[in-house]
A protein has these predicted regions:
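Surface-exposed short loop/turn segments
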Residues: 31-47, 111-171
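Sec-dependent bacterial lipoprotein signal peptides
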Residues: 1-30
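Short secondary-structure boundary motifs at beta->alpha junctions and helix caps
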Residues: 80-90, 161-212
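A structural "domain/chain start" motif
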Residues: 30-95, 219-231
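Soluble periplasmic/extracytoplasmic beta-strand elements of cell-envelope proteins
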Residues: 55-60, 73, 127-132, 149-155, ...
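Acidic, proline/glycine-rich low-complexity intrinsically disordered segments
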Residues: 94, 103, 107-111, 122, ...
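Sec-exported extracytoplasmic/periplasmic mature domains
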Residues: 102, 106-110, 211-219
Length: 231
């Protein structure tokens, strides 16, 4: 009986040891997986000296589901998309766009975004609703055609607490604008940092245009902005 017990013990030890070995191999394989690279959009704009706007409210942006994700999506000219799981935004692209649109407008206008600040009413404010139908990184066999394609529309609505609710209260209180453009990616450098830098430049153009539309509405003037249609 003692010999049988020893054999059983020896067999159990081997099985257990084999299980530990496989677990170690599995963990080693997992640890060797590529480490993702993370990128952020960063608005870099120059302040407007003539801005009198003090309060804005930047709402979450609209963005197609196909690109509203953390992994960076590259699209080719045929419409085929490639999701880069190891090249990622630090948050979803929609959040990156909203947060940096807000940061850029605050810097550009010298204003405070009350959307997340808890600031109450009492001052004239401007609510900005933005919808990106395109913010696509487009790859091409022809390096000269690599670009970030942008199509964006926005509505700026003025909230003036001093205006009473009468038949004229909606006059000059809202402005709707749209723009589309391509931002070329430098053909001499296809690194992801250059792609992200180009996306930043594209966002900066949007920030500049939105800021000028807010300034126009604040001054009760028609918005005349290069490459932008406003009604």
């Amino acid at each position: 009986m003692k010999k049988i017990d020893k054999k059983l013990f020896h067999t159990a030890f081997i099985v257990r040891g084999t299980g530990v070995l496989f677990a170690a191999i599995f963990l080693s394989a997992c640890s060797s997986s590529p480490v993702p690279n993370y990128y952020s959009l960063t608005a870099q704009v120059s302040p407007l000296a003539n801005s009198k706007v003090t309060v804005i409210e930047v709402l979450p942006v609209g963005l197609p589901d196909r690109i509203n994700r953390a992994p960076i999506v590259i699209q080719d000219v045929t419409g085929k998309s490639q999701i880069l799981d190891n090249e990622r935004w630090t948050s979803t692209l929609g959040t990156e766009l909203r947060d940096n649109l807000s940061a850029g407008l605050q810097q550009k206008l010298g204003a405070v975004d009350r959307y997340n600040s808890g600031m109450v009413g009492g001052k004239i404010s401007y609510r900005i609703a933005t919808d990106f139908s395109r913010f696509d990184i487009v790859n091409s066999t022809n390096q000269a055609n690599e670009k970030v394609e942008v199509s964006v529309a926005w509505i700026v609505k003025r909230n003036d607490p001093t205006i009473t609710l009468d038949q004229n209260s909606n006059q000059n209180q809202q402005l709707a604008c749209r723009m589309s453009f391509n931002q070329a990616i430098a053909s001499n450098n296809k690194q992801m940092q250059q792609v992200v830098s180009t996306a930043n430049s594209a966002l900066n153009r949007v920030v500049d245009a939105v800021a000028l539309s807010i300034i126009s509405l604040d001054a009760n003037k028609s918005a005349r902005i290069d490459g932008v249609t406003c009604t």
